[in-house]
Each structure stands twice: as C-alpha cells, then as structure tokens.
C-alpha cells in the first residue's frame, strides 16, 4: 500500500487495541533483524534451570480409520491402526524445555499405578530428571485418552472422535503436599525461572502458589503461571500469565466488560501480573501489559490442524524469552512462533515444541518478510 508521498507501507505484526499498525519499509527491515535476534536467543538458551511445578498426566492416543457407522446407532466404528502415549500437562512443558536445551526440574505427583510408572518411564527415556516426581500410594494417575479417526481415503483429515478422562482431582493432603512444596522452595534460589502449570488436579493450591511466588520474588526469579480460571487468585504477583482466548472471553462476560482489553487491564491490576498472554490459536497471540496498549501478533499459518499443547508451548517459549531478557513484545513474537509449530502438529510428537521446529518457524517468518519486500 502506498500513501500520498509514495512511501510503501505494510500491515504486519499487528494491532494495538483495535488500531492496525502500518509498518514502513525501514521498520520492516528492523523487524526482520528482530526475528533473527530472537532466533539466535533460541540457539543460545542452554543450561538454564527451570522449575516446573504442577499437575502431570499421561496423554494416550488411539488412531484409526472411521469408515463406517455402527449399524444400531449413529456412532463411528474405529478400525484401530496405532496407539501412542506420552507425558502431558506440566510434563509437556518439561519435555519442550528439555528439547530447547534448558534444564527442567519437574515437581509433581503421580499415582502408584501402571500409568504412573509409564509416565515416569517416558520422561526418563527422554533424559528428563524425574527425581522430584512424587508417587502417591493409592492415588490414580491422570490419563487423557483421545480417540482420533479419519476416513481411509482422507488420512490427512484426522478428527478427535472422543476423549476419555481417568483422574483423581482431589487436592493432596497437607502431609503429601508439604514435602513437594518444601522441595520447590529449596530449589528456587538455584533456578532461573519458575513455571506453575495448574490443571486443577490437586497439586497446586492457594497456599502452595502463594509461597512459591513469594519465594521466587524474594530471589528475583520470574514466575510464569498457566492457571485454571477458578484459580486466578492463586496467581497474584506472577510475571507472566497465560490464558486461552475462550477463557478471556469468559472472563469478559463474568466481569461485564465491553471488550477484552478492558478485561485484561482489570485482571492485570487486580492480580498484580507483569503481563498477560492470550493464546488464540489461529487468531494469534495477544499481549496485555499494565496501563499499555495491547499487542497482537497474528498467526501466519494458512491452515491449523489442532490445538493440543498450545499453552505448554507458550510457557516453554516464554522461558526462552525471559532467559535472554527479551522485551515482552519480542516474547509475544516468540510465543506466537511456538504456537504456530504446535498448531501444525499431526501426531503426539508434533504436539511438543522442539528447538528445530521453533528455529525453522522463525527463519520462515523472517524469509517471508524479505520476500514481501521484493
């Protein structure tokens, strides 16, 4: 697009509030350099110690062909072709951090059942330290089983047909919670970042969250919090908080605001957050900061395949950003690139953020900008 003076402008990176930002050629070159700088940060993020505390679960996937309906009911009949499983939730974050070259220390509880053993073994097979996983006698390990089907003639159009959840979401008793919390608090001074991943399965409670955040602040260790909407008070004082867009819309309605920008400012001030990252999938990533305009980094994908692991990828990317002292705007760019990697995932391994996937995505984004200038 050309203005009256003949200078070319390009719509890129975003929006501030509802206003489209028009970036000139000179600014776009700066943005390309910025992408390259962010990409270099991904390469240099090694040996950073990250505490990941929260709920873990075993993600199980059953794949097959759904060519027919049952003769007595309108339900698909799945011809099973494959089964896969891997560690999910907070363990998903740890897996991504490990692949990115950081050093995750995972603090969580699992059951003393075969699923707990499988979850622990899957992490050990990846080289992730499991010494801080607590096996609780008589507790059931959370398992999410997703049944995914496609027509045999359309193998690339997979759809989730059903999800089965097996879980024990009762809060841990104090005598079981206390050793986990004490271990986390002891490790905070030796760590660079804390990630709290609350899936409402019993590990995180108000007292634990408050003590972890307070201890981290005292040690100048930033906290990233992925909260349940019912647990927002737990997250007070966090440096960065992650929401999904549907959660943000729910909060807007609950608080009776006209738009999500007003909602975000309310939440930021009420909970003393440093920043709020709203993950929108195909709608990109929106960054809200206290008393500042919002920034939207749009998703550049022409097609998205799934959304499993989006917030986990975002949390891992934020760790890279904080490790390298990037500005929050650059952090939003990195988070968006991480989400784009996962949005293209086609199977269990594709739902986990990897260094190769993230650097490739950043390279592609910078290349697309260069092409657009020709």
Spell out what each predicted region is.
Residues 26-38, 171, 190, 207-237, ...:
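Conserved phosphate-binding/catalytic region of the ribokinase-like
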Residues 36-46:
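A short acidic-Thr-Gly-centered motif at the start of a beta-strand
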Residues 55-56, 199:
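Active-site metal-binding loops of divalent metal-dependent hydrolases
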